[in-house]
């Protein structure tokens, strides 16, 4: 396992007066990703990241994984120059802290103790997915610096217009960090543990790379699975039937 640094940032309305709006192109907020064409969306840098693909985000909305019932209300920000998409941010109005994998219960409790509303808050993240990827999506031929600033300006305006307590960008990239810092966002550093495959010849070689305590734990857990007669079967492609999907959903 390897510790990987994760970056998230937070912004409160209190300091909004620091900024002057950047004159740029037309901005829109869309309640559904489907309102933006797949072709236009795919021109932006960052949408090659699997969880930022148009089809993936649309599937979350169409399946109701994202929506009012789950507390993730889409309000995706787009910037346009004439009919060309210049930039975008996946934004969600949140009414709970679930599915983010960045825990801010302490902030929510502090707001409540002082008689303030922490929810709704405005969040840019991939729902239910703690994976690092670009959050400020920009067309490769656009002025990246100015488009990123304009995206943040418009997101802050959205935060105020919707009476949200704060604006959050979760699991941002190091590439984006300077623009957040320049605009006064608070940066939060955290860690994830990622397993790396060091080209082990077999499972025994992997076990041999561990400390004695961890090795014994894994051996014991695997023995318990065998004793309970649990079988693991991997299904792919057409072998996955509707009844499998329904069972998994339940």
What do these predicted regions represent?
Residues 4, 9-12, 16-250:
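N-acyltransferase acceptor-side catalytic subdomain
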């Amino acid at each position: 396992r390897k510790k990987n640094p994760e970056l998230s940032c937070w912004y409160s309305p209190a300091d909004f007066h620091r900024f002057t709006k950047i004159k740029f192109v037309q901005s829109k907020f869309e309640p559904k990703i489907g309102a933006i064409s797949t072709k236009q969306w795919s021109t932006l840098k960052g949408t090659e990241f699997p969880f930022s693909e148009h089809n993936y985000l649309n599937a979350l909305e169409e399946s109701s994984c994202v929506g009012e019932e789950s507390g993730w209300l889409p309000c995706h920000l787009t910037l346009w120059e004439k009919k060309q998409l210049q930039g975008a941010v996946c934004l969600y109005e949140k009414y709970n802290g679930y599915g983010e994998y960045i825990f801010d219960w302490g902030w929510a409790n502090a707001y409540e103790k002082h008689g303030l509303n922490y929810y709704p808050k405005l969040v840019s993240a991939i729902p239910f997915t703690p994976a690092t990827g670009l959050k400020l999506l920009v067309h490769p031929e656009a002025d990246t610096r100015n488009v990123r600033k304009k995206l943040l300006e418009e997101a802050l305006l959205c935060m105020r217009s919707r009476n949200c307590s704060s604006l959050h960008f979760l699991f941002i990239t190091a590439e984006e960090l300077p623009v957040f810092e320049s605009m006064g966002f608070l940066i939060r550093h955290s860690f994830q543990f990622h397993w790396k495959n060091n080209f082990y010849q077999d499972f025994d070689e992997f076990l041999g790379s561990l400390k004695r305590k961890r090795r014994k734990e894994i051996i014991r857990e695997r023995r318990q699975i065998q004793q309970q007669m649990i079988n693991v079967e991997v299904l792919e492609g057409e072998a996955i039937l509707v009844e499998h999907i329904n069972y998994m959903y339940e």
